Amino acid sequence: MRIEPLLDELRLLATNGLEYADDPWEEERWERVAALVSEYAGETVDLPPEEVRERFAQEVGHVTTKVGAEAAVFDDDDRVLLLQRADDGTWGLPGGWVEPGESPAEAAVRETREETGLDVELAGLVDVYDRRPGECGFHGQVNLVYRCRAVGGGIDPSHEALAVEYRSPATVEAWHADHEARVADALAAR
């Protein structure tokens, strides 16, 4: 049994409990649950409990699943724009978390510009993908993948990328998470 889904559910309960607690004893109980989650979550991701607790504390209000957006940008030869991630060396679509006040579509455009240097415009939604806690990191997440066209800029990798290239999907030796399937879906949707 994986412990991450349990810890994430307890984290959500504690965060929401603290948000809506209406007496000091209830607040104290939820603080204790949050401290235990931080301790055990820290062991699963090799971080001190204090750092985990600080990260959790940055989430305010009702906690929901994280929302991400990615861009599938193809050239005329059906090669896809990929970045080699600096954190694990795998290849994946440009993308990231949706910022407050931003739509997922806007996030896909922004993240592509930030990570690759290219300006893109949307051509359509490919699909919506979900990951449960522990499948790819600690948090549950929903990711929207958009087909996009490059309309300007030039390849200029950010600090998050070791490389940015148009690649034939068949030549990619190590994919990030389930990005191979996402690229196949985007190619089929062209």
Where are these regions (language model features)?
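Acidic, metal-coordinating catalytic segment for phosphate/diphosphate chemistry
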Residues: 24-27, 31-70
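Conserved Nudix-box catalytic region and its N-terminal flanking loop in Nudix hydrolases
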Residues: 75-114
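Short, hydrophobic secondary-structure boundary micro-motifs
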Residues: 19, 49-52, 156-159
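Residue-level signal for pocket-adjacent positions within structured domains
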Residues: 62, 86-88, 93, 150, ...
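Nudix hydrolase/Nudix homology domain
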Residues: 1-32, 36, 90, 159-190
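N-terminal strand-loop-strand
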Residues: 52-91, 120, 124
